């Protein structure tokens, strides 16, 4: 299958690209910066800009040749303060990219067969007590609005293109993301829960997320919205306890919420608040997780990558 990949040069893409190559797909990767990725065609463009999708552009030509598209594009959510300018970037990098992509798909003489588009569990808002499935309504905060607009943009694809939306939880990998930031601190023995420790963490091992995307591209039974999370969300306190145990290090030194708010402003809510997002539809499909429990996920991501089985599949 010839695939066009957007937003696949970061944390998820580092595993997704070789997994898709191993499955025999031919890849064109879009990046805003020049970079070397073995075995793929690379297009240097900013997909959030309408000009990048102009008739005759390399991006437009690649789309017209693609049988499938994976769109994970979006600036990181919780890495700096949510100033008005940064919020604009968070929205534009996701929503404008998706709108331009969908408009190009609509006008393409040969639309792709499938679009796998990212969203996030932030769609549901936050709660200390409620749990959320794909049927739960949207929340009422900034991230809910962002995810809602993102999904609406993706939902405008023509009926001829099968749409799969993945509401992604916290992606666990040792080389980046939330866990990648926590590991150096925990390894020195100074780790601990962030904020109250009672906030929920809906997580997924990166390998399982990549397997889900790989499977959804070719399995015609995938359609609609899926919570891309493991079925065992945990409170932050439990996450840190298990991480400390996996590293044989203590997890006793909490990071006070006010400190994080000082650093990230409103963006601290991503870390200090959470939700229990349950993968009801994936479980109904019988999706096979390589790491269904947190201890299995930590064992997987903390051991050498070569030991991890990455082939997609279900029971």
Kindly label every feature range from the protein language model.
Residues 3-23:
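N-terminal Rossmann NAD(P)H-binding glycine-rich loop of SDR-like oxidoreductase domains
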Residues 35, 39-97:
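NAD(P)H-binding glycine-rich loop region in Rossmannoid oxidoreductase-like domains
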Residues 87, 99-141:
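Conserved Rossmann-fold NAD(P)-dependent oxidoreductase catalytic core, especially the SDR/UDP-sugar
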Residues 119, 152-174:
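Conserved beta-loop-beta element that borders a ligand/cofactor-binding pocket
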Residues 160, 172-181, 216-226:
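Glycine/proline-rich active-site loop of Rossmann-fold NAD(P)-dependent oxidoreductases
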